[in-house]
Amino acid sequence: MVVERQRVKEQDKIQRRSNFDPVESNLTPEQVKLEASRCLHCKNPRCVQGCPVNIQIPEFIKALKEDNLEEAGNIIRQTSMLPSVCGRVCPQERQCEGNCILGIKGQAVAIGALERYVGDNTQAEKTEIKPTGKKVAIVGSGCAGITAAADLRKAGHEVVVFEALHKLGGVLRYGIPPFRLPRTILDREITNLKAMGVEFHTDVVVGKSITLKQLKDDGFDVIFICSGAGLPKMMHIKGENLNGVFSANEFLTRVNLMGAGRDANSITPLRIGKKVAVIGGGNVAMDAARTAVRVGFEEVSILYRRTEKELPARLEEIRHAKEEGVQFKFLHAPIEIFDKDGYVDGMKFEIMELGEPDASGRRRPVGTGKFVTEDVDTVIVALGTGPNPIIQKSAEAEGMEIITDAKGYISVDPEKRSTNIPCVFAGGDVAPVGASNAINAMGAGKKAAKAINEMLKV
């Protein structure tokens, strides 16, 4: 008998428009057993090759098939300390599941759903930690920082994490909405790190509150910079500075971190208009649009300069956005935002067509000379982010010039994540190697931790 791919239960698409509760539930134990039985246990598992942190996927699925849930958890956590997070936010269709043999002619094994189930229902094994006497400072508490902190602490080093915001988690906290990543899940992972002995300090902006040189003077043997990329990329068009224009980072931070628009006690203002245009087509654009629906905008549209085929967002996020009433308007390139008394009063777009492929492999949008206007009162720009140069500038002022590329990202050895400064490493969005997402940031954290451990061996 052929077993069909098991589906998680989802919250009603109308009901979820007005709450921030998780959209998806876990598979049931019975579904987990059925889904695990679908794995072919290939001799050369392509799924593992597609995983940036090399989780031994067939092995943990075999453990599930044999009703050994704890063993499945142990196998995953040998290489990933964040299974509950990755099971929810990783682009599995382009990585592990995208490489699954079953997916060639049918439906891939639901690896992400299985990983999430294991993460939610198991705890990390307690390991004996033998102190090495070495100290490591980690700048940033996002995916790369959390992952590196776990691996470095297991090795016995004293690990101190410095976070610029008042809450821990980085983009997992301020960027990804709770309907995708429940905060209880994130808090549990951080609590586990604290139990291991990792020390955290919030409201510390490295480069301003304290410098790299001061960290070294304070006795840190190594510094790992994983402060993210918090500077939004804007459109550079007329009207972009009007009231009612937000970067996606600002909009999501106000709602996710500060409670604006969803917490009556929030002191962070957020003017809720009627019609919002979200510019972009990635996961952040989907998060912003779906969040806008939930805080009360009457009409939410995503405008993208290519076609649906080229959307870089996860297929699941696109589907969920459509189900929740988000409109998609393709081949629209922003030209101007109209001004009325200092506020957004509509937007002008040029209609595009697709030309030859660009460096990304996607067909390049080309203007047609035809224009349309959209009646909107709010604009959210989700076109990506760049690195904040505050750490590099403060280091340079103290005689530690960190080499960066033309876009301002820290240049690193792709395997070790080492910089040109001795004992200073960098990873995640501040020094990206490959696509910018949670699992690649975790991979960077693991590579950095491995190189740091080798360097600190006595």
Regions found by a protein language model. Give the residues of each.
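Glycine-rich dinucleotide-binding loop and its adjacent helix/turn
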Residues: 115-129, 188-208, 232-295, 404-415
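A conserved FAD-binding loop/helix module that cradles the flavin
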Residues: 430-458
